[in-house]
Amino acid sequence: MSAGDHERNDAWQRAVRAQFPIIAAHPELAYLDSAATSQKPQAVLDAVHTYLTSSNANAGRGTYPWANRTTEAVERARRRVAQFLGDPAPGHSTVHLTSGTTEGLRSVARDWLTGYLTDGDEILVPYADHRANLAPWLEAQDLLAARGVHVRVRPLPYQEASGDYDHRALSSVVGPRTRFVAATHVHHVYGGDMNVHRLRAAVGPDVPICLDAAQSVGHLPLRLDDPALDVDFVVFSGHKAFALPGTGAVWARNTRGPALRVGGWQGTPNTVGAVSLTAALDWLDTLGVDRVNAHVSALTTRLTDQLRHLPAYDVLGCPASLASSTELPTAQRRHGIVTFRHRDIRSDDLGFILYSHGFMVRADSLCQAGVDDTGGKDGSVRVSLHVYNTENEIDRLLAVLASLE
């Protein structure tokens, strides 16, 4: 990058950072926990304030102007999600607003999968990803068993060293009764792109795939109109993509198997959350997700390149050996998440030390399926980045980590 390009990038980054009031108000702190939740730009806060002070009402329960505007706001959020994701099947697809990824995955499991599977069917699910992408499928298995329908849940093969799915081993677990696959787009611990586009070739053209996109929406240019991303459900959390807590969505293609129909009386929707979700996606489109991805990827590379030279730390997933293999280089495979352990300091203790220096990180088992120890050998420290983070924050973090060698 030339000096001029560097100056322009710095100016862009300062302008973006200034749009986050909580970040601007605390320059002494570095928020490095965006995989847990994102901070909110002024545009989202303004949209919420405008709605609450001009047309706050219930949706679908009145004919007066405030109620009509609220109903339209909820419908607009659904349309905005479909547009943002590049909906390739607008004549068939549906968008259901949820409280987040966990509820969204449960909805697919409870409201769709339990009506789709028959006795003897098999499903492939990730046993080494976030617990929210495992528990709903096991719960669905139990619900079906109570009805006398017995299905087999098989682990999606993965490579322990990298955290990536073992695409070569998929052929050994895919069979004639494979009816459904659940997968993760970007791993919440390792930050790796899980190469989900390769799943379709392995499972065939007729098996529905559900994608947990909690760590990719808002980070990567996820476009469902790209034939390489041929999935049937996309589930994500709005609060990780600059919207308010308690927001999320399920996009359903509805061309493989029955249409997703969320069961039961829905009650009052999260109208404020819907307004915030639309505003957040508008803001992201204006900023440019490609630009966000480039900025965060550069910071991720800066951190991983230096952290690997500190002998006291073990970086989890995406090992350096991949950089010289036929796979994508390590730095390109990480998307804003770097997780590590100190060889002598417990992860929870390291988290406290880092906060004493102004760094807010996640330090525990990270909700990873099969990991229960929150602070000992199975615990880890996760640094997760977003558009408001800076090179200076990365360099200061590295200096503190180096001092603990």
Predicted regions and their residues:
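Pyridoxal 5′-phosphate
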Residues: 1-405
